[in-house]
A protein has these predicted regions:
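Domain-scale signature associated with acetyltransferase and cell-envelope carbohydrate enzymes
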Residues: 1-117, 139-140, 174, 183, ...
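Glycine-rich NAD(P)-binding loop of Rossmann-like domains
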Residues: 77, 128-138
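Beta-rich strand-turn-strand
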Residues: 95-99, 147-161, 166-169
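A short, glycine- and basic residue-enriched loop/turn
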Residues: 135-136, 153-154, 175
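Short helix N-cap motif at coil->helix boundaries in the Bergerat
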Residues: 170, 187
């Protein structure tokens, strides 16, 4: 697709449909879901187990070939939880599995195919039990790169970046960049530099969302329903 051919009213209707889908099908599966959420293709977000909590202004982007999966499978009665803070973003293919607890604090971003788990899910010698478990804590404003894996018992400090494909098996301190298998610190961030987070992006949500709507109205103003249907059935290079 070279551009969005939908007329404004179709895109607006689609957005309302996704919000309704989240409220009808996904919200009841969660212990809490904050307001201001954005779910892209929410029918590809799969939830299993409880408790799972998601904070305000969450952004979840799923796809047919890369579903987001949040799974709580307790190793003992009364344990197991996934807690996702405010302003967090999960990209296509993200998987989070919790036998004890996985906590993402505010402003965290997980790129495509990231896997976070607090368990081995099988023992080395006992392949029946869940195996060793240890809670995972990802502190505020952490950015985890594409296809990285965060293993049991890990704590990642605030503002830290985890490189693409990294395998994190030990704690990573705050304000650094870590990469590799196993992940090691490769660079320290300058603590004197001002850090801009997703919280600032959503600081004035009414104005922000009104701006998005105004942009769509302008950008899609020339699109007609007839042209959109023709594009779907008979696409051409001129589209």
């Amino acid at each position: 697709m070279r551009k969005d051919h939908r007329p404004y009213f179709v895109k607006h209707l689609y957005h309302r449909m996704t919000v309704a889908y989240v409220n009808h099908f996904i919200r009841p599966q969660l212990d809490s879901l904050g307001w201001g959420f954005t779910f892209m293709k929410p029918w590809y977000v799969k939830i299993f187990g409880a408790p799972i909590r998601i904070g305000r202004f969450a952004t979840l982007v799923a796809a047919s070939d890369r579903r987001i999966r949040l799974c709580v499978w307790p190793d003992q009665p009364g344990r197991g939880a996934i807690v996702i803070g405010d302003y967090c973003m999960l990209c296509p293919g993200v998987r989070i599995g919790a036998a004890q607890a996985v906590v993402l604090k505010d402003n965290c971003m997980l790129a495509g195919n990231v896997y976070v788990t607090d368990s081995d899910w099988h023992g080395i010698y006992n392949r029946i039990s869940v195996g060793k478990t240890a809670a995972v804590t990802i502190n505020s404003n952490v950015w985890i790169g594409d296809s990285a894996i965060v293993c049991k018992g890990v704590t990642i400090g605030e503002n830290t970046i985890i490189g693409a494909g990294a395998v994190v098996v030990d704690d990573i301190p705050a304000n650094c960049i870590a990469a590799g298998n196993p992940a090691k610190v490769t660079r320290r961030l300058d603590p004197a530099r001002r850090m801009v987070t997703r919280a600032q992006f959503f600081a004035d949500p009414v104005t922000l969302f009104a701006g998005f709507d105004a942009f769509d109205r302008r950008w899609l103003a020339q699109n007609t329903f007839r042209h959109w249907v023709r594009h779907l059935l008979f696409p051409s290079r001129s589209d």
